[in-house]
Amino acid sequence: MLPFLRAITLAVLSALALSAWAVDASVLKPPAGAKVAIVVFEDLECPECASAYPLVWQAADAHKIPVMLYDFPLPRHNWSFDAAVWARYFDTQDTKAYKLGNEFRQYIFANQKQISRENLQQWIQRFATEHEVTLPAVNDPDGKLAAKVKADFALGQQIGVEHTPTIWVISNSAVSPPLVEEVKDREQLSQMMDDMLKKAEPSAAIKNPATKAPKLKKSALNRQEKQNQGVKP
């Protein structure tokens, strides 16, 4: 192909890709009653997701906005899909806006370096025991929880997610550029939230935002931050 034709072709393809991205990203909307939300596509086996997790929730809590988690277990990770299905199970064991499921995700991220496909079940049992939850003999026998994980993954593919974490700050009228793989600090997210809040259209306030963006325990946050820095708690 001649150089100038190749350049034109690449330009057209890039324009089409950007157009498709904008259309696809528009499917992301805050939950009812919220003007702004954080959307996170994550993989429980992903080290960058573990690093981003406390920053996301701290920023969300500071701004009193909800976090919308989507499972995106990467095929190269051999236990992340099973962990995501178990997180969905723990979601069903608590009526407080998935509080127990989010605590399980936090727990997995905090212990991620020690978890393997071979010992994952032991960590799940330990978490269940600590939280006085009885585990089923067979998790998700009808495949409904796995189907939800797969649906999240399919949505991610639809809107162009390829890496984890991929994070958007969205409003009811706009979508930020995505943060992909790396979240440097809480201020980065906070600035994006402030920008989205300015762009958002008026909306009814969430009566109890803490139920949608639950606070992480300080001890757990400190433990997570130390582990991310390579310091034992």
Task: Kindly label every feature range from the protein language model.
Residues 7-19:
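Bacterial N-terminal signal peptides
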Residues 1-7:
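Positively charged n-region of N-terminal signal peptides that target proteins for export
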Residues 20-25:
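Boundary at the C-terminal end of the N-terminal hydrophobic targeting segment
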Residues 53-54, 125-233:
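C-terminal cap of thioredoxin/glutaredoxin-like
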Residues 32-46, 67:
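Short active-site neighborhood of thiol/selenol oxidoreductases, capturing the structured segment around
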Residues 31-32, 60-62, 79, 158-163:
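Extracellular/periplasmic catalytic domains that process cell-envelope and extracellular macromolecules
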